[in-house]
Amino acid sequence: MLKNGVISDTAKRAIAGMMKLAPSITAFGNMNPTSYLRLVPHQEAPTNVCWGDRNRSVLVRVPLGWASKTDLCKQANPNEQKSAYDTHQKQTVEMRSPDASANVYLLMAGLCVACRHGFSLKDGLAVAEKTYVNVNIHKKENSKILKKLDTLPDSCAASAECLQKQRKVY
């Protein structure tokens, strides 16, 4: 995920795939009608198709906390011994829309397909750049950025339609 302490182009391509397939991924990650009660603007759960690092207003968050040379495990658990592993290469991403109704097997398979799709996109890096957000998109001063972003489906039926439209990728 990281190259010289920054997110790599390979990781950006994987994220681009997640951005492209985010609408249909909700069909696997939000499988009942009540799931969509939390997917409303200005709540903790994301509603817009975007990503960022250390940003809780985005759909795919790259924490980047592991990118530092600090042993975060040791910081969080002071009574533990220092990790013997080089943790700065242990980068993660978070897809923040799924909830407890998710079919974890279909969701993980969908995310894998999305990453693979991102690797094959000719414009993958451009997609990643276009959907990258480094501000809280819910603040009033960032409303122009918010308006440029696609939104996630707002119901099971809308998610199913998105899955139907993108089914060839799967």
Regions found by a protein language model. Give the residues of each.
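C-terminal accessory/tail domains of diverse enzymes
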Residues: L2-Y170
